[in-house]
């Protein structure tokens, strides 16, 4: 029997073994692929999204005199957001909540139908990473050349390639940061100020900050963002079912895999692949994968659904005269059916899961459209003066002071009527408006602004049957007939 000290020594890891809490990072070197359906779809998606990103701020939309004419604008100093004919005020931020709900449910709906198509084709991380890798390939070569270049000692040739890549990355990053700030001020003004040195240091700082994100995340972090930083990859599989379209490997057809011995000269494909699977273990599916995984190991968290492995495998199958689809973008139900020799089944688009997602999206969208169509064109806010709360006047009268704010949300001047209710024989006087002892008063508010008015409400002491009574103020828009009411207190001495 060994002694305790001997057992402890025997259980210790070797002294040269590295112990780590984290997985080692193996840099992915994606192979360049310029052919195939999904590769072309990725290029098309990138072109559309980047064109919209850089060109959308230059679109114009006439909103009238004195209003910004940029179609898409988030005016932070003016506390307003514009999207073509839609204008959102700060108190209407609930529209943003509705849009976020629709976006989330839309992502769930698309995931249930098409898998991680968002990650593979439309996510900004994927789009930018594709662009940065493309630049890297232009300077450093394709996969094998880049691997060899990283292993080579530093030389003028290596330095030149790396420097050219870095300069291009920095210029692209600055272009991305520049595009971002165009959404927050007039595009032509921002462009002029940035390129003539007249912009504020804060604006230059925002451009640099927003340039640093794609430079670091798309240039260096790349697949690490998708695997470790993005929360969507952690729960996306919960939205899949057997009818969701995912990238998968037909193991029943590809196994046993193995490299071809002796080539195919003089033999038919049936003779070459007799007694073995169609997979020739060329590892092209691994080499073109932006995250560096092997799809033959099954569906994985790191698979972003870009389907480049499908294009690569189809090209190999064409070369060897075998049917396409060894790696396919299909549902697991269809794949299981084919493995049993059943006829090709159609993907079920309408399922309880997709129906629920689409129904909730429709309900939220309907509520948003209704609230927008019936949105208020003005708002009312009333504040009671606190010092003093009330004043006792001669003739047994009580006076309370109020500040009212009328928000006119249209471009033209608004004409409003203010009326009192709830306190018998109450009258008012508005500072800056001629007349006293009025039951009603007309107030004008310039377009797209807040009108602030100070008024004094006076009532006989006999009208108060309590220390505090409810006073209702009603504002009527004389142009539209719509009303807004606010109930406050009318204070007095103890009765």
Regions found by a protein language model. Name each.
Residues 432-461:
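Intrinsically disordered, low-complexity Pro/Gly/Ser/Thr-rich segments with frequent PxxP/GP/PP motifs
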Residues 458-495:
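Terminal connector regions
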Residues 391, 422-435, 480-481:
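Short aromatic-acidic-glycine turn motif
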Residues 111-126, 218-233, 270-317:
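Cysteine-centered iron-sulfur cluster-binding motifs in ferredoxin-type domains/subunits
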Residues 346, 367-369, 375-394, 398-399, ...:
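Long, low-complexity ectodomains and other extracytoplasmic segments of secretory-pathway proteins
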């Amino acid at each position: 029997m060994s002694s305790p000290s001997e057992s402890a020594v025997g259980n210790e890891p070797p002294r040269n073994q590295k112990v780590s809490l984290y997985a080692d990072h193996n840099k992915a070197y994606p192979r360049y692929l310029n052919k195939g359906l999904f590769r072309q779809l990725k290029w098309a998606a990138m072109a559309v999204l980047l064109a919209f990103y850089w060109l959308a701020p230059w679109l114009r939309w006439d909103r009238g005199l004195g209003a910004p004419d940029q179609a898409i604008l988030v005016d932070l100093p003016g506390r307003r957001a514009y999207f073509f004919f839609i204008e959102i005020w700060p108190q209407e931020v609930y529209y943003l909540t509705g849009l976020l709900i629709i976006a989330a449910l839309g992502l769930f709906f698309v995931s249930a139908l098409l898998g991680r198509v968002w990650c593979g084709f439309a996510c900004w991380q994927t789009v930018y990473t594709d662009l940065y890798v493309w630049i890297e390939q232009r300077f450093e070569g394709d996969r094998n050349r880049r691997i060899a270049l990283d292993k080579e000692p530093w030389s003028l040739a290596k330095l030149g390639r790396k420097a050219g890549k870095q300069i291009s990355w920095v210029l692209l990053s600055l272009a991305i940061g520049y595009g971002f700030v165009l959404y927050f001020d007039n595009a032509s003004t921002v462009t002029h100020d940035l390129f003539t040195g007249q912009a504020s240091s804060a604006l230059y700082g925002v451009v640099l900050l927003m340039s640093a994100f794609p430079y670091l995340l798309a240039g260096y972090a790349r697949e690490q963002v998708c695997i470790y930083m993005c929360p969507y990859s952690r729960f996306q599989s919960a939205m899949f079912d057997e009818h969701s379209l995912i990238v998968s490997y037909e193991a029943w057809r590809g196994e046993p895999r193995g490299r071809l011995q002796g080539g195919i000269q003089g033999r038919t494909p049936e003779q070459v692949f007799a007694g073995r699977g169609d997979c020739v273990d060329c590892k092209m599916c691994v080499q073109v994968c932006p995250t560096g995984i092997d799809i033959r190991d099954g569906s994985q968290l790191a698979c972003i659904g870009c389907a480049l492995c499908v294009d690569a495998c189809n090209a190999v199958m064409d070369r060897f005269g075998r049917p396409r689809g060894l790696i396919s973008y299909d549902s697991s139900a269809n794949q299981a059916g084919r493995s049993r020799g059943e006829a090709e089944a159609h993907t079920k688009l309408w399922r309880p899961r997709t129906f629920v997602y689409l129904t909730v999206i429709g309900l939220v969208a309907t509520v948003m459209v209704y609230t927008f169509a019936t949105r208020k064109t003005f708002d009312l806010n009333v504040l009671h003066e606190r010092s003093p709360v009330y004043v006792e006047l001669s003739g047994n009268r009580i006076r309370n002071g109020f500040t009212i704010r009328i928000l006119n949300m249209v471009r033209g001047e608004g004409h409003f009527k203010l009326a009192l209710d709830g306190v018998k024989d109450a009258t008012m006087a508005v500072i800056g408006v001629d007349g006293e002892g009025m039951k009603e008063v007309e107030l004008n508010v310039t377009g797209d602004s807040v009108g602030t008015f100070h008024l004094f409400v006076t009532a006989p002491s006999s009208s108060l049957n309590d220390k505090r009574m409810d006073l209702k103020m009603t504002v009527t828009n004389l142009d539209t007939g719509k009303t807004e009411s606010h109930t406050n207190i009318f204070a007095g001495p103890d009765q």
